[in-house]
A protein has these predicted regions:
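Extracellular, repeat-based ectodomains that mediate carbohydrate processing or recognition
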Residues: 4-266
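C-terminal outer-membrane/trafficking sorting elements
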Residues: 272-341
Length: 341
């Protein structure tokens, strides 16, 4: 893989399969394919060269700060390591990478993202340290200094929670989605036989925005799997996944999606010292009433959190099913124009 800097050079990363272990290396090349002047012909070592490493992922931090690399390395089975690398090729953290998780058994299926300011990153993975089932665990990364604080448990259910996805949706705000094995044990026979999607969020300076085990994102018959999040419009993002709810005698895969919106902050403690912060969730009357082009929903929250936003018609049919990311406590607002009916 390669990451381009602000000019015409590229940092390239590769797996070198040399007995007794595969190892990770990197170098810089110019647009003409030649190794940059002064850089070693055989590249720099990224991982410990004496033990195996794989599942490398690299993302650009900024035009000035270089890149962040995250990978699996053999240790207590499969561990998670990371390294910040400047555009000059210098590793910013400890040699061979800084350990993110070196617990017993496997830590795998790594996902990470960097916020829009390039000041923080968040790494999540599926974790088998208890030896009986997989949980989703994450860790905040301060890109100026390295890992911060303690690991964050997003799940602790006795079923398997696996294949996490993390996406930065604003400065210091991250959405986390995963495949959840509770779908195999639903009490409703119409909703069993496959993994469901659950989710949470993480806000730098606050923490995770839901209780342990998250909130349901899509709980339907058969599998809801392979989630992805892409930029949609403005501050909105589109969460989309493969969905097998229509399966019968044979599996039938469709594509489903829902919008992740960010609410407008009407007031918070960051704006006025005399604002009274609510102690619980509350929604106000919708206005204007009757409907006049667009209606607004005002609500209050006492902490950053994910809010389920649903609109129903008079027959009870769901016509809006969205997730609202509210990144601060206080008074918030979302609007709806009825155009998606």
């Amino acid at each position: 893989m390669c990451i381009r800097d602000s000019g015409i050079s590229f940092l390239i990363f590769w797996v070198e399969e040399v007995w007794p272990a595969s190892r990770l290396k990197y170098n810089r090349v110019e647009l003409n394919g030649q190794v940059s002047t002064g850089w070693p012909p055989n590249g720099f070592n990224l991982s410990n060269q004496s033990i195996g490493a794989d599942n490398l992922s690299v993302k650009k931090i900024s035009d000035t700060d270089g890149v962040l690399a995250v990978w699996n390395q053999e240790g207590n089975f499969s561990d998670v390591y990371a390294q910040k690398i400047g555009w000059d090729g210098e590793a910013q953290w400890e040699s061979n990478g800084t350990p993110i998780s070196i617990e017993e058994n496997d830590q795998s299926a790594i996902s990470f993202d960097i916020d829009e300011n390039g000041s923080s990153a968040f790494i999540v993975w599926e974790d088998y340290r208890n030896g009986s089932d997989y949980d989703i665990i994450g860790l905040e990364i301060d890109l100026s200094s390295g890992p911060t604080g303690s690991e964050i448990y997003f799940s602790s259910d006795t079923t398997n929670q696996q294949k996490p996805l993390v996406k930065s949706v604003a400065a210091g705000e991250y959405i986390i989605i995963w495949e959840d094995g509770r779908g195999y044990y639903n009490s409703d026979p119409l909703l069993i036989n496959g993994v469901d999607l659950y989710g949470s969020a993480y806000v730098v300076g606050f923490g995770k925005t839901t209780g342990v085990d998250g909130i349901p994102i899509s709980v339907e018959y058969h599998d809801q799997k392979k989630p992805a999040i892409t930029k949609y419009s403005g501050e909105d993002h589109l969460l989309h996944w493969i969905d097998l709810r229509s399966s019968g005698k044979e599996d039938l895969a469709n594509y489903y999606a829902k919008i992740i919106r960010r609410s407008d902050v009407l007031s918070s403690t960051n704006e006025k010292a005399n604002v009274t912060i609510p102690s619980s969730f509350n929604i106000q009357s919708v206005y204007p009433n009757p409907f006049n082009g667009q209606v607004k929903f005002d609500f209050t929250i006492n902490s950053p959190q994910l809010v389920q936003f649903n609109v129903y018609d008079i027959s009870g049919r769901t016509i809006v099913d969205e997730i609202i990311m509210s990144g601060s406590k206080g008074y918030h607002q979302v609007s709806w124009d009825g155009k998606n009916v």
